[in-house]
Amino acid sequence: MRVGIGRTRPVVARWGMASGELKFGSARVLRLGGGLVSAHLLVDDAGLTLIDTGLWGVPGQVRRAVARLGRRREELREVVMTHGHLDHTGGAAEIQAWSGARVWVHAADRDHVEQAVEYRGLARGCGWLETAGRVVGRAQGRTYCPPVIGAELRDGDLLPVWGGLRVRHLPGHTPGHCALVAERREACGLVFSADSFASYGWSVHRPPWFLTRDRVEAERSLRALAELRPEAVLPSHYDRMDPALHARRLAKLVGGGA
């Protein structure tokens, strides 16, 4: 199976290495966050959808983006979290309180979002980092509070947002780690690959072992993602907002060339 963006090539307007926008007809993808970890605001005439909520700076970016677009906060109806690590959920409660959005996450990562997970073995390193992140957040006056989870992601489901987002459960990094595949005509096949891999000019790599719950399962999931043969990919950790570039990097990584 090969998924791609068809004949409609995205128009990329770069605002620098850590930000940007893709246009697919009247639909858009806005990158929020920064070079360390990104969230993505999906925009079309039907409403707004946020994929992941980054850390504590993202809620302010969301508010500014919505205002710049001339949209209302109530139009941000869905927040889809690819998995429950703190760098993807840190702003969820604040964004939910501001917009009233429903929050989606896979059932297997509910305890991650609620910060009730017990990290074991080598993955304890992730727990230590998240503890440090919460301490830094409190020092900045931003105590982590979990959002109210309103819906669960399931493998194969088609989310009724942005023309349709197909859920692909890719466990390993976390038990409930998911990717999302766009099915709208203009952007069919654009994959939001979450933390399946990181993509930078200086390094294209799998998530560090101490951030991954099950490395064997994560490798199976990475290969399952590559087997889709996507032509357009946006990871959560990347440099340039160039989906075709990240698709090529993914193929090279799994093929053994990176």
Regions from the language model: what does each represent?
Residues 56-58, 84-89, 112-113, 175-177, ...:
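Active-site environment of divalent metal-dependent phosphoester hydrolases
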Residues 41-42, 152-185:
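Core dinuclear metal-dependent hydrolase active-site scaffold
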Residues 49-79, 123, 140-143, 148-149:
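Pre-active-site segment of Zn-dependent metallo-hydrolases
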Residues 51-54, 77-84, 103-106, 169-172, ...:
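Active-site neighborhood of phospho(di)ester-bond hydrolases with catalytic His/Asp-centered motifs
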Residues 97, 158, 181-182, 188-190, ...:
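Divalent-metal (often Zn2+) His-rich catalytic cores of metallo-beta-lactamase-fold enzymes
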Residues 59-105, 109, 232:
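Active-site metal-binding motif and surrounding structural segment of the metallo-beta-lactamase
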Residues 110-168, 213, 217-229:
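Metallo-beta-lactamase
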Residues 18-69, 179-196:
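Conserved beta-strand hairpin/beta-sheet module of binuclear metal-dependent hydrolase folds
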